């Protein structure tokens, strides 16, 4: 059903290409997963390009849980342990311990502080001591192979940033409705029109990578 709804935004391949261009130009994109999975829409931004204003938008219209999607290589560079040793979450969402920039922030909660934390974490020469633990940014570990291995928003964020020629690090936040419920396909389309953010699905990305 979602593929029919999203056909107004082009073919699956076209939707991915439009999203990649948006990320290259510093805009966010909206990614919906499968209807039989979480059936949620996430805002995704390239970590290296996300602005304070975009972070404020994500905090205001999202769940408030700001996640930084990282590769295993980056997780090891920052020496971030996983949040739990035995992951029992339904979709094996791979949180590490939460983080905060060690310098340049106050409480760590503001949009500006969270951007500082993200920029600190993705620096080429970042070291573990650059970050305090815990904090107000939630790193997520992407699985090797991206969406071809796991059809999650975490993997979509890494795949999209890599395909866009950017650092493999993305920021995501689930989109919520005004009543606090999760935004589904029709609400995501309305949000897209309101905030000029292209829409695609994880299935689109799978099709793009499988060509």
From Swiss-Prot:
Annotated binding of D-ribulose 5-phosphate, by residue: 37-38, 42, 150-154, 174
Taxonomy of the source species: Bacteria, Pseudomonadati, Pseudomonadota, Gammaproteobacteria, Candidatus Palibaumannia
The encoding gene: ribB
Top-level taxon of origin: Bacteria
Single Gene Ontology BP annotation: riboflavin biosynthetic process
NCBIfam families cross-referenced by the UniProt entry: ribB (TIGR00506)
Enzyme class (EC, first level): lyase
Function, in words: Catalyzes the conversion of D-ribulose 5-phosphate to formate and 3,4-dihydroxy-2-butanone 4-phosphate.
Signal peptide: none
HAMAP family: RibB (MF_00180)
Disulfide feature: none
GO MF assignments: 3,4-dihydroxy-2-butanone-4-phosphate synthase activity; magnesium ion binding; manganese ion binding
Pathway, per record: Cofactor biosynthesis; riboflavin biosynthesis; 2-hydroxy-3-oxobutyl phosphate from D-ribulose 5-phosphate: step 1/1
A Pfam family reported for this protein in Swiss-Prot or TrEMBL: DHBP_synthase
Site location (Essential for catalytic activity): 136, 174
Co-factor: note: Binds 2 divalent metal cations per subunit. Magnesium or manganese.
Organism: Baumannia cicadellinicola subsp. Homalodisca coagulata
EC number, as in UniProt: 4.1.99.12
Protein name: 3,4-dihydroxy-2-butanone 4-phosphate synthase
Positions contributing to Mg(2+) 2 binding: 38, 153
Gene3D superfamilies cross-referenced by the UniProt entry: DHBP synthase
Amino-acid positions noted as binding Mg(2+) 1 in the UniProt annotation, renumbered to this chain: 38
CC cofactor: Mg(2+); Mn(2+)
Family indicated by similarity: Belongs to the DHBP synthase family.
